[in-house]
Amino acid sequence: MRSQIYRSATKAARSFLSSSKNASSRFLPEGRTVAATAAVSLRVKAPYLASFGGANASGTWMSTALAIPAAAYLLQDQEACAAEFERTFIAIKPDGVQRGLISEIVARFERKGFKLVAIKVVIPSKDFAQKHYHDLSERPFFNGLCDFLSSGPVVAMVWEGEGVIKYGRKLIGATDPQKSEPGTIRGDLAVVVGRNIIHGSDGPETAKDEIKLWFKPEELVNYTHNAEKWIYGDN
């Protein structure tokens, strides 16, 4: 019975949260306003319903009165937490794919605590590669760079986490592997700049543009990772 209560509470909480987005409170943050509304509503109903069902009905409705605001607050808290996290675009280039380095690279981001929210394998056209490297169109190596990116399969990914854009770049290392520190992906796994195995967004705006170029909105998965409380929790 209690599991049914909490499932119903979560469903009701989602409904409250959805409707509250169109009418925010002047006095309380959105989640707390919704929770308070749910609690007040059920406290009014509980005595009335209890008169028909006795103590068990009263206990059930009071449990629900506690469950709905709690669920609403937790859902709101999850949404707020997710909104704080950055997202970055990471691509394993054809050389990294052909050398069998996919799992090695993915593992490094996972071990850091970042969350994978999108991944696919594609062979981009040269036109697509030119769109990706549009900011380098005036550089002498532009044509060769686009030829290489479109020469084979690319593993395109979106990673999420606190500081993922800046730290992702540190994790990747300098563009020239010869200048990359040991411990970085390029420092450990690449030798020359023309085969530096991986690409990562260099800033928030670039990340947004690259994610939009490579992925449709529905390909990005929003979810709460079970390890997040062990990664981001406060003591």
Swiss-Prot record:
Xref: Pfam families: NDK (PF00334)
Q: Which UniProt keywords apply?
A: ATP-binding, Chloroplast, Kinase, Magnesium, Metal-binding, Nucleotide metabolism, Nucleotide-binding, Phosphoprotein, Plastid, Thylakoid, Transferase, Transit peptide
Which PROSITE patterns does the UniProt record give?
NDPK (PS00469), NDPK_LIKE (PS51374)
Highest taxon, organism lineage: Eukaryota
State its location(s): Plastid, Chloroplast thylakoid lumen
Q: How does activity depend on pH?
A: Optimum pH is 6.0.
**What reaction does this catalyse?**
a 2'-deoxyribonucleoside 5'-diphosphate + ATP = a 2'-deoxyribonucleoside 5'-triphosphate + ADP; a ribonucleoside 5'-diphosphate + ATP = a ribonucleoside 5'-triphosphate + ADP
> What does the record list as GO biological process?
CTP biosynthetic process; GTP biosynthetic process; UTP biosynthetic process
The record's EC number reads 2.7.4.6
InterPro entries registered for this protein in UniProt: NDK-like_dom, NDK-like_dom_sf, Nucleoside_diP_kinase, Nucleoside_diP_kinase_AS
Enumerate the GO terms in the molecular function aspect.
ATP binding; metal ion binding; nucleoside diphosphate kinase activity
Q: Which principal EC class is assigned to this enzyme?
A: transferase
The residues listed in the UniProt record as binding ATP, with positions renumbered to this chain, are K93, F141, R169, T175, R186, N196
The active site is formed by: H199 (pros-phosphohistidine intermediate)
One GO cellular component term, please give it: chloroplast thylakoid lumen
Q: Which cofactor does it need?
A: Mg(2+)
**UniProt similarity note:** Belongs to the NDK family.
Q: How does it assemble?
A: Homohexamer.
Against NCBIfam families, the record matches this protein to: PRK00668.1
Q: What does this protein do?
A: Major role in the synthesis of nucleoside triphosphates other than ATP. The ATP gamma phosphate is transferred to the NDP beta phosphate via a ping-pong mechanism, using a phosphorylated active-site intermediate. Shows the highest specificity towards GDP.
Name under which the protein is recorded = Nucleoside diphosphate kinase 4, chloroplastic
Annotated source species: Spinacia oleracea (Spinach)
Q: What gene is behind this protein? A: NDK4
